[in-house]
């Protein structure tokens, strides 16, 4: 793929007809690393008001030395990193004289080990034997050490100062391993964070889970320096406690003595779902607390669960678990009516009574938190910006991250400064927003917020035929309350320039998800020109998923759900927000960017694409990944169309295809559909494609960008051979740990003391040569604002820093659901909404999940074709913003 840009040659003709018949080619594999180079930074931005900031990046001073890289192969394999670290630590101490001397290696827990001085083994392979004391018997490991390479920190320093075009990955990896070695030994590592058991605090989440606090740490190349990004962190762990107590928490049993009967089927299923995959340790063998992983929970209680007991004469007899524990351990079970845990391999039939098992400490909860647990977590962890700043500074200055000075850093001559990095950012000007009506009022956001009072939509939709379906019980939502709600909605909608004419043509109560489809079919057949169904919901209910499945995919009807609490107690703000969503769904335009303030990219036809991939929760092999791409359909941009696909789930991806876990597999056809629709909507062919890609981690960026760029290019060529619009590919990242703080207290904004909306940083803590920037586009309401990170991976359109930063900030003001700027550009946000909506389209309506979380997988008889059909939007809806 050549780097010919639109700056050098305009190759697109506006008046050439798009041919909609040709197909797309298949995506390609990952790029050779020497072929794909992101564009260099085009210069620093200058637009906006300067603001003095602090960032939670700490300067790392590195010496101009070589570091020696060795491969470590430990047999037996597939041991936890914690065990591998113990093996290597023991090896370094045991073989100090002949091999390691005064070296204190940094080790990553897998295969990579680094030393400050070469080991006296040259390039030979060395085989060693290491013994660790075990429970009952010692464990012996065979360790093979092999020289890999010499890693130059001198080259890294040259890259940081701009004398080399590319930052050497091997040097960054070496530094990362060395700085993480000691905390990895002392704490519980989770990803790039470290946690320790609660001391002096206790934040239960319910369901056997609790909050653990810790810190995030990662080494990052920046302008002139390496930086250590340090942040406070929190996550959910399983509480170390008896399994009996764990079960009571999961099943909401206040006291185990209340559970006098065997578990019901629903109780057992719920308990199994929570405990499967967890490690437990036994308490009936004295000091030898053997650990097992739970694979199942038995249907029968311990008093009835049997297994074949081998007798001394070689024969086997059926024995219950309760009998066995009484005979073998003289242990009379207190709760023989409760089930057993099946542990180890399922085919081996190893059973343990609940009462002899404890949950092993230090197990992170990877399963999805419930809404209540998430709410509790947020309350426990939210910190205002000044509080978070103070906490991070205290953490670093007290050396409590690593429990004191780090001998491994000292070994390599590495020094971490303990002051946050000072830098100058800029606060970008907010765009003005054009409204409609007679007055054509203009709104100017203040700190990311503006008011719609006294303003009318730029293009409001007149609603003549509409219906109301109330799924809340009549005693909760009386007819007079419904009437009051519809009257107030009509008044607010008229004020907003989206008049709802007359009373609803249909207003009835209904019950349960099963009634949704027949009711909606009746409405479609009976009321010609029906534009909208307002659905009242009684809180969390599977009805929501069914409403969206039927409305979006089956019948092509616009639906707007409202929680009953907002009907019983209405507010102008809630009703106004409903109108924002309804107008967008029906094809209206709420507001537009004032044309004369828009960047120059708008001078030619341009399409804005947003893309995202959402994955099922870890360990859930039944649910597929979902890819979504949206595209703007006008020149404002305000209207968008969506495309969505079901992708092969992560569990089905082979080792060779790991690079494509995040790649949108059918991107070529998805972009092609959007380009055709853009042409139909505008009669123009876009000469520029601006692609905002969410959901990609830092390590995946280049691997994902190459096949996706090729797919976008192929989509264009499939429409016409010489159609080559300029592509700009930008990764949008929210999942990072960079935080910005105001140096001057007077510049803090809001109750949480955050940086102002529009704060932009493209120097000091950004990449030494590549085109990236941080932008905090929203006003923080709770906790510390997280700026979004933007990394430009391809740019045919030759954006300046100011142009792209301003464009991105303006797009954050075009999100239709609220009168606030949001944290990422609208197209990227919409792609997330589309992907999450598709999850509801896959929900099995027969399942009683209040959260709509049961998604049919292939094991439920739905093959890939059926899944693809389930997320296919009805032709009457597919060109609307049904996801708004």
From Swiss-Prot:
Q: Ranges for the PAZ domain?
A: 242-361
GO CC list: cytoplasm; cytoplasmic ribonucleoprotein granule; nucleus; P-body; RISC complex
Output one GO BP term. mRNA catabolic process
Subcellular localization, as worded in the UniProt entry: Cytoplasm, P-body
Record bears the keyword Transferase: no
Q: Which residues form the Piwi domain?
A: 532-843
Q: Which domain of life is it from?
A: Eukaryota
- What is the similarity comment for this entry? Belongs to the argonaute family. Ago subfamily.
Q: What is this protein called?
A: Protein argonaute-4
Originating species = Xenopus laevis
